[in-house]
A protein has these predicted regions:
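N-terminal regulatory/effector-sensing and dimerization cores
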Residues: 1-74
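Short helix-to-turn junction characteristic of helix-turn-helix DNA-binding domains
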Residues: 91, 140-144, 188-195
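Terminal helix-turn-helix DNA-binding modules in bacterial transcription factors
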Residues: 151, 170-214, 230-233
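Alpha-helical residues within the helix-turn-helix
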Residues: 155, 166, 170, 203-204, ...
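Compact structured core domains
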Residues: 42-127
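Short hydrophobic/aromatic patch on the recognition helix
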Residues: 24, 164, 168, 212-213, ...
Length: 233
């Protein structure tokens, strides 16, 4: 399954991860993954269901046609190219649709090829199993700028900062600061999709300047904000 929105921002949550997906990205969801899709703002969602027998087109770089299910066993966020965005509305999505004609089969094959070529984006946010830490993480996802310190967030769930720091390491393999940066990036991407200026995004997320925010983005994803936050027209 591929979920994407032509307008607005969606959030998809599986058992141990959540993804905030703006119109410039799509989310690949493998079979048998229970998930919940939440509309964060007015959004037009399109969902593509990929047949189990589907194969990517073969080419010089990949001479053997591969299955997307074999290549992508886990959820992943993909960049949406202008071509992919234009192709999707031409697929017949009506319930009980007739057998696709040759034109639709060609479009579907090209959609799969665009998905194969799409660059993955590190937008997944891991979620813990521990109930206290899960409650804290969900609160941060809902209000990422309410507090900045670990001490304040730990008090919110009635735990000591030391306990919360230990849980972040044992449950998520990262520090509180590293995990919160991923949340801020996801929310920044949603704000960029609404065409908000970089200075406004930086200020909203608690950064003293746009340059400080730019440095964080480069350090975290290895791309400048102009590239990472690029959205399809």
């Amino acid at each position: 399954q591929v979920a994407m929105s032509s307008t607005g921002v969606i959030r998809m949550s599986a058992a141990r991860s959540t993804y905030i997906v703006p119109p410039s990205r799509a989310l690949w969801i493998p079979p048998d993954v229970e998930h919940v899709v939440t509309v964060l703002e007015d959004a037009e969602i399109r969902t593509l269901y990929v047949h189990p027998c589907a194969r990517f087109l073969a080419d010089a770089q990949a001479p053997d046609a591969a299955s997307p299910f074999a290549m992508w066993p886990a959820c992943r966020v993909l960049e949406v190219s202008p071509l992919l965005r234009e192709l999707v509305p031409h697929l017949d999505t009506a319930p009980g649709a007739r057998e696709p004609d040759e034109r639709e089969r060609c479009i579907a094959a090209l959609v799969l090829d665009e998905l194969r070529r799409a660059a993955p984006v590190r937008l997944g946010i891991d979620l813990p199993a521990d109930a206290r830490l899960r409650r804290l993480c969900e609160a941060i996802l809902d209000h990422p700028t309410r507090w900045t310190s670990l001490e304040d967030w730990a008090a919110h769930v009635g735990a000591s900062p030391r306990t919360v720091a230990r849980l972040f390491r044992s449950e998520l393999g990262s520090s509180f600061g590293q995990w919160r940066q991923q949340v801020l990036l996801a929310h920044a991407l949603a704000m960029a999709a609404r065409k908000q200026p970089m200075a406004t995004i930086a200020a909203e997320l608690g950064y003293a300047s746009a340059s400080a925010f730019t440095a964080m983005v480069r350090r975290t994803v290895g791309q400048p904000p102009s590239r990472f936050f690029a959205t399809a027209p």
